[in-house]
Amino acid sequence: MAARNAFYAQSGGVTAVINASACGVLETARQYPDRIGTVYAGRNGIVGALTEDLIDTGQESAEAIAALRHTPSGAFGSCRYKLKGLEENRAQYERLIEVFRAHDIGYFFYNGGGDSADTCLKVSQLSEKLGYPLQAVHIPKTVDNDLPITDCCPGFGSVAKYIAVSVREASFDVRSMAATSTCIFVLEVMGRHAGWIAAAGGLASDERHELALVILFPEQVFDPERFLRAVDEKVRSHGYCSVVVSEGIRGADGRFVAESGSRDVFGHARLGGVAPVIADLIKERLGYKYHWAVADYLQRAARHIASRTDVEQAYAVGKAGVEMALKGLSAVMPAIVRTSDSPYRWEITAASLAEVANVEKKMPLEFISADGFGITEACRRYLRPLIEGEDYPPYAGGLPDYVTLCNVAVPKKLAASFSV
């Protein structure tokens, strides 16, 4: 059987370790030249497939591919472009198959979150209907940690580490200034519906470093009065308070506290900044001087402080995705299965995309403390291993030495263009 080519694309918000997954895919594919020819990457994600804007990863040296493991963000470009329903816009999916057929692509690796899992499943279903042989594998990635079945999502562990470290360091800072200056620090973190990232801030405080923290989770209805009492108690007992707030907290009316009224391309409510809203509330009602910050891109781009566990898992799911495809599996996702908390042990298994697509994993309520503003010991047991270990990139001139690929374009074979 002749070798067939593969297509790899990155989707949605990038992470500190998504390129490690790309590295896992590419290095593993290169080990099977008799089965996989060239791995093409989509320039700017799935949009690259629709527009036949493909990148020939075969033009990259082994050293450059290896360097992806320690390089953040998306080396081939990503996108926030959601393919519509299969019946609603069949033309988009047929276009993908058309491009795949033109370039003899028999393997489809889509590296992203929940929406990407849905797209991968639909492409698999359509290829089967059209009689086009294709192994479609979803490579998990999301800092939100909200994909089902898998113990955790590659990308989350490094964000969790960044937030835990940042909250600890900022809390030390505000604690030292509180007597005569700022006594409130508010940090806004990502997490539209799931409070995993906010929970990671709770790791900043432990038996060795007791810090005055209040965490606002999207799983809990935001009650301004209860929140203000909690903050006031912390300031009175510790002299200061650090607040970690998820961007997705909602009020009793069900609306996002930070909702701006518009929606993004996925139809999700576009959120403004919740940190200044919370900080202003504290100032107005309690009179405390504050500083606020939004972790934003910093939390997901911080490869210099990535979790070694996260890097290893990101690479592993990329590698496993190729191995699953070569075994003939399709419409699956490499899922991480935890076999032990301490020491932390895990393995990879194949999860059906039918059970992954359009399912959002919330943080268990038993991970939130009884007062609603902290994390429990069960949550700590879950989170701690995910931020363990350091995996520093090489440095040059005092800065991380990341790789920029050549990203050589593949000549187009189709006469028809496709607009997105």
UniProtKB/Swiss-Prot annotation:
SUPFAM superfamilies: Phosphofructokinase. It catalyses: beta-D-fructose 6-phosphate + diphosphate = beta-D-fructose 1,6-bisphosphate + phosphate + H(+). The record marks K141 as: Important for catalytic activity. InterPro entries: ATP_PFK, PFKA, Phosphofructokinase_dom, PKF_sf, PPi-PFK. Optimum temperature is 30 degrees Celsius. Substrate binds at T142, V143, D144, M190, G191, R192, E247, Y297, L298, Q299, R300. Non-allosteric. Pfam families: PFK (PF00365). Its EC number is 2.7.1.90. Optimum pH is 7.0. Its cofactor is Mg(2+); Co(2+); Mn(2+). One of its GO terms (biological process) is fructose 6-phosphate metabolic process. One of its GO terms (molecular function) is diphosphate-fructose-6-phosphate 1-phosphotransferase activity. Keywords: Cytoplasm, Glycolysis, Kinase, Magnesium, Metal-binding, Transferase. The keyword Nucleus does not apply. It comes from the Bacteria. The record marks D115 as: Important for catalytic activity and substrate specificity. GO terms for cellular component: cytoplasm. HAMAP family: Phosphofructokinase_II_B2. Catalyzes the phosphorylation of D-fructose 6-phosphate, the first committing step of glycolysis. Uses inorganic phosphate (PPi) as phosphoryl donor instead of ATP like common ATP-dependent phosphofructokinases (ATP-PFKs), which renders the reaction reversible, and can thus function both in glycolysis and gluconeogenesis. Consistently, PPi-PFK can replace the enzymes of both the forward (ATP-PFK) and reverse (fructose-bisphosphatase (FBPase)) reactions. Homodimer. Belongs to the phosphofructokinase type A (PFKA) family. PPi-dependent PFK group II subfamily. Clade 'B2' sub-subfamily. NCBIfam families: PRK14072.1 (NF010675). This is Pyrophosphate--fructose 6-phosphate 1-phosphotransferase.
